[in-house]
């Protein structure tokens, strides 16, 4: 955000979750240094989104818990009341929650440009954002390709540890 307020769509991008998200990019660069395009770029964005939620939860333990919707909204404080992304229900932000499912940005034969978000790095991060939500909170359902799932949530401490250990081995 450029600070001009809601008339431009964003207030300054200075919320806790956005700041943690940006620091998450630094962690990703220092650990696995994924190429910022296509599927690796979407994983990079997902790591950063997950750090945003994890740190926001850590900073506000008395105000929120793992099921609080605000923890799973990214940038709701800077996007004039609506989140930039929804980690709990990515489709509500126009992002996919299933690889190759509804809202998936096709990456095969995609040439990364600024105009296509480097082949959908922000859009396709929704798949792994949903994964992180599920391993943290748990949930069940049927995804876009017909696979049934039932996940027992681990909570933020264990989910965050899995997240970081994954970054270390990629």
Language model regions located:
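Active-site neighborhood of glycoside hydrolase catalytic domains
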Residues: 23
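Zinc-dependent metallohydrolase catalytic domains
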Residues: 1-20, 28-170
């Amino acid at each position: 955000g450029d600070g001009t307020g809601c008339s431009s769509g964003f207030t300054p991008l200075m919320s806790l979750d956005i700041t943690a998200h940006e620091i998450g990019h630094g962690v990703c660069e220092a650990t696995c240094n994924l190429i910022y395009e296509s599927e690796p770029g979407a994983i990079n964005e997902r790591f950063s989104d997950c750090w945003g939620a994890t740190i926001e939860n850590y900073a506000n333990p008395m105000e929120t818990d793992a099921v609080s919707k605000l923890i799973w909204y990214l940038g709701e404080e800077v996007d004039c009341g609506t989140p930039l992304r929804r980690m709990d229900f990515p489709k509500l932000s126009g992002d996919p929650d299933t690889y190759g499912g509804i809202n998936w940005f096709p990456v095969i034969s995609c040439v990364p440009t600024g105009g296509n978000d480097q082949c959908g790095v922000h859009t396709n991060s929704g798949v792994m954002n949903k994964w992180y939500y599920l391993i943290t909170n748990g949930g069940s359902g049927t995804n876009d390709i017909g696979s049934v799932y039932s996940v027992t949530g681990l909570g933020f401490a264990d989910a965050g540890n899995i997240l970081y250990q994954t970054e270390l081995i990629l």
